[in-house]
């Protein structure tokens, strides 16, 4: 994946969090003052508005000239397309590797919706602990202004560092487990968001670029499946208690870092071969 593509997905990721920031605050306020039914109704209404905006704006979307050229070229077989087809199993294998590693990462990251809220309620005695979730989109938007969001010097290094960053976030909680200071929680969100910014846009770009364009939707579905599996794992860990979840997440992050470091050891060679076949 190119640096430009990584920056494009970083902007998409930041745009999503533009909506996440106010929604976490408004949702928590509605739940606290009017109850869960009103909060869920507001979320449903906002979703309908988003779908309506998408449908209205859909008519303005037009296929780009590059898409038309790509369709025309794909109609005629060539040595390049045959070479790319021969690489298909290896590329789908790399997609699977990325999604497995991402699932391990998301098990830890999605603790922000479970374990971190329990931690805030028990340690900080907050009436609306959901408000701390706004720290995540806020950090995403701030980090989007830094070179970190578009940095792609080494793919494997970036993915490993993402796991290390969120692992450090849980290590920070272990250090401050007997403290009631909100700074520990803020530190967790900052480190976890650094990991998210390193991995999420790059991962989306990689799974899309590794497969033919006609299979991009399927590859993205696998990526989102890894997010869903991570959320399920986060829920299971949260049910075991804060202490268990924090320690287990730290171990999972270590496993994810090792997974990326080992499984992507031939990543450079593979991407080099793919570029040669596309020249």
Task: Give, region by region, the residue ranges found by the protein language model.
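Intracellular loop-helix junctions on the cytosolic face of multi-pass helical membrane proteins
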Residues: 2-6, 10, 22, 27-127, ...
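Glycine-rich segments within core transmembrane alpha-helices of 12-TM secondary carriers
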Residues: 6-32, 44-50, 133-137, 220-235
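Alpha-helical transmembrane segments of multi-pass secondary-active solute transporters
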Residues: 8, 38-43, 158, 219, ...
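Transmembrane alpha-helices of Major Facilitator/SLC transporters
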Residues: 129-152, 162-170
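C-terminal transmembrane helical hairpin of 12-TM major facilitator-type secondary transporters
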Residues: 159-199
């Amino acid at each position: 994946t190119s640096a430009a593509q990584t920056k494009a997905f970083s902007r998409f990721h930041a745009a999503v969090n533009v909506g996440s920031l106010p929604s976490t605050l408004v949702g928590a306020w509605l739940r606290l003052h009017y109850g869960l039914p009103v909060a869920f109704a507001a979320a449903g209404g906002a979703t309908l508005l988003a779908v309506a905006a998408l449908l209205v704006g859909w008519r303005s979307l037009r296929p780009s000239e590059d898409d038309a050229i790509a369709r025309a070229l794909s109609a005629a077989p060539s040595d390049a397309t045959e070479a790319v087809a021969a690489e298909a199993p290896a590329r789908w294998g790399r997609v699977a590797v990325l999604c497995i590693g991402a699932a391990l990462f998301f098990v830890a990251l999605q603790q922000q919706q479970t374990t971190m809220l329990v931690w805030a309620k028990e340690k900080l005695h907050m009436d609306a602990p959901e408000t701390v979730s706004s720290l995540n989109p806020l950090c995403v938007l701030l980090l989007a202004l830094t070179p970190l969001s578009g940095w792609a010097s080494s793919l494997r290094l970036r993915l490993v560092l993402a796991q290390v960053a969120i692992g450090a976030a849980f290590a920070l909680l272990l250090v401050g487990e007997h403290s009631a200071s909100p700074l520990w929680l803020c530190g967790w969100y900052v480190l976890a968001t650094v990991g998210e910014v390193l991995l999420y846009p790059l991962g989306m770009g990689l799974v899309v670029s590794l497969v033919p364009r006609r299979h991009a939707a399927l590859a993205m579905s696998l990526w989102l499946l890894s997010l869903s599996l991570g959320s399920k794992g986060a829920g299971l860990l949260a049910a075991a208690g804060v202490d268990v979840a924090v320690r287990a997440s730290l171990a999972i992050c270590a496993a994810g870092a090792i997974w990326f470091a080992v499984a992507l050891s031939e990543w450079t060679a593979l991407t080099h071969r793919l570029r040669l076949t596309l020249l």
